[in-house]
Amino acid sequence: MKETDIQAPTLSSRNTVHVVRRLWHMSMMTLIAYLYWTYFTKEQALLLITTVGTVFLLGDCFRLKYDTLNQAILKVLGRIMRKNELTSQSAMAPFILALFIVVMLFSKPIAIMAILYLGVGDPVASIVGLYYGKTKLFGTRKSFEGFAANFLVSTILTYIILFSFHLGGHALPLISLIGGLGASLAEASPLVTDDNLHVPIISACILWLSLTFL
């Protein structure tokens, strides 16, 4: 089946579709971070990620194999899916992998921040860049305005979350700046891997280094 054969729901404009998808992304990632923060231990979270991830990936495979199932799913989720996802694997697959990695390797505060960097900072950068982006970052399709918005939001989030966990001490403002910069650089980087994969992992590593050595 060709991509052009699939009739996904349409909105009034491509920009509106993009914003809806980003807001959905933001709400889901924020919910995941909240649930991990409030209700789950590392071990419980890893078990849940493995279980849900396996079910989701199997469902995605069946969706791509059976056109009728794919059409039914598109009627519900078509508005929040990227065009290339209509006939290929969902972008949730690399996110599930990244989520498992950051939860397994890092402490809860760092893992939560990695999720929020992707779930809040990335959509903010995208939406601001879409409507206000005029200056392109060198060597990328990303805008300076989106980068700056991501940096500001990610820095503030880092300060709030780390302060809540009593981390950072006197170096907290500097660590927050480094965390925000790391997240925004990861989002703006021209890496060929999916943002859902490299943004959480790279930003978690940078935040861990900052907390360890500052």
Give residue ranges: language-model regions.
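Interhelical loop and helix-boundary elements at the membrane-water interface
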Residues: 2-47, 61-157, 161, 170-213
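Alpha-helical transmembrane segments
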Residues: 44-56
